[in-house]
From Swiss-Prot:
This is Small, acid-soluble spore protein P. It holds the Pfam family SspP. It comes from the Bacteria. Induction: Expressed only in the forespore compartment of sporulating cells. Residues 1-12 have a biased composition (Basic and acidic residues). Residues 1-45 are annotated as: Disordered. InterPro entries: SASP_SspP. The gene is sspP. Transmembrane segments: none annotated. Belongs to the SspP family. Keywords: Sporulation.
Length: 45
């Protein structure tokens, strides 16, 4: 029960911005996109 509550709390907190769950994927996605772009450009160039 506690574990289930924690999971729900994390999910509810994620959109709030208190949990690193949401900001992490957002930052990671941006970093990955930028890195991918540079990698592709380097490969093409």
């Amino acid at each position: 029960m506690t574990e289930r509550h924690t999971a729900k709390d994390i999910r509810k907190n994620a959109p709030k911005g208190e949990n690193p769950g949401q900001p992490e994927p957002l930052s990671g996605s941006k970093k990955v996109k930028k890195r991918n772009h540079v990698s592709q450009t380097n490969g093409e160039g």
